[in-house]
C-alpha cells in the first residue's frame, strides 16, 4: 500500500487516478478546490481536502494531515492546471500570474512542502502539456499556459538531478 497525493481531483485525470489507486488498495489524499465529486464516491481509501493551490495557507492543510495521519508520502501527482486562452497581445500580467500560480508556483511549493515526507523510492509525477514542449506555435492562444508547462518540465529535470542521491524520482507526463 502506497500513500499517494494527487492534485486536481475534481474531474478528468485526477478524478480517475484517485479512484484507480484507491481501488488498488492505496491510500489517496485528493486535493481540489471542489471535493464534492470524490466525496460522493465515499471510498474508504480516499481522503479529500479542499485546497486552493494558489494559497500557501491552504497548502499547509496538506502537511498537517500528512504529519498527523500518514507520516510519509510515496507518490505526489501534480495534476491540477489553470488555462487562460487568449491571443498573446491580449494577455495581461494578471493572466500570467494566475496561470503560473497554479501551474508552476503551486507545483514547486507543494513539492517543497512534501520533500521531508518522501523516502528512498518516492516519486513525483507532474502533468505537463505538449504545449510546454512545442510552444504556442502549435497551440495559439496558450502562451501563458504553454510557457508555464515548459517551466515545470525544467523544474522537474532540475529536481531529478538535485534529489537523485536520495533516490527520489521526478518525471513529467506531457499530454
Each PLM stretch: what is its role?
Residues 10-11:
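Conserved glycine-rich cofactor-binding loop
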Residues 74, 153, 163-175:
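Conserved Rossmann-fold SDR core element
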Residues 79-84:
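Conserved NAD(P)H cofactor-binding loop of Rossmann-fold oxidoreductase domains
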Residues 111, 145-148, 156:
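Active-site helix of classical SDR
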Residues 116, 161-162:
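Alpha-helical segment proximal to the catalytic Tyr-Lys
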Residues 129:
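Residue(s) in the substrate-gating loop at a strand-loop-helix junction
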Amino acid at each position: 500500500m502506497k500513500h499517494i497525493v494527487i492534485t486536481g481531483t475534481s474531474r478528468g485525470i485526477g478524478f480517475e487516478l484517485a479512484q484507480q489507486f484507491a481501488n488498488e488498495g492505496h491510500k489517496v489524499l485528493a486535493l481540489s478546490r471542489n471535493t464534492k465529486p470524490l466525496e460522493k464516491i465515499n471510498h474508504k481509501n480516499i481522503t479529500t481536502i479542499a485546497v486552493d493551490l494558489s494559497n500557501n495557507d491552504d497548502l499547509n492543510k496538506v502537511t498537517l494531515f500528512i504529519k498527523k495521519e500518514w507520516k510519509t508520502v510515496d507518490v505526489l501527482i501534480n495534476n491540477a492546471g489553470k488555462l487562460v486562452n487568449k491571443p498573446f497581445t491580449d494577455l495581461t500580467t494578471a493572466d500570467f500570474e494566475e496561470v503560473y500560480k497554479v501551474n508552476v508556483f503551486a507545483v514547486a511549493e507543494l513539492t517543497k512542502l512534501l520533500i521531508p515526507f518522501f523516502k528512498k523510492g518516492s516519486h513525483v509525477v507532474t502533468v505537463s502539456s505538449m504545449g510546454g514542449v512545442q510552444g504556442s506555435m502549435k497551440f495559439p492562444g496558450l502562451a501563458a499556459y504553454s510557457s508555464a508547462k515548459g517551466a515545470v518540465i525544467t523544474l522537474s529535470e532540475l529536481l531529478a538531478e538535485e534529489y537523485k542521491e536520495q533516490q527520489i524520482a521526478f518525471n513529467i507526463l506531457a499530454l
